[in-house]
């Protein structure tokens, strides 16, 4: 449904990657000794505004303990089940695609699993 202003029809996404993790392993003298972690989006903040975003909401949170990977939120996964887990970058992309009216598994596919973050987008 079209909004009343251009702002209502425009989704702005501000994404900040705040750190990276280093490759680690027991013996890094050979390629087999390396373990490559997911070195992007270790800590990320995201702001969604305009479009179909739900107003005045903070979803998730943070912890100053570097061992904490984020706070679990409700996510509608690919199977249609609502699960509670820490969101990933793929979940953010799926949520943005959902705001554009795209359907998971039909209009787009993200390898490795993803879900739409609940309560971020109003429809």
Where are these regions (language model features)?
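Feature marks hydrolase-like catalytic cores characterized by long aromatic- and Gly/Pro-rich stretches
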Residues: 1-123
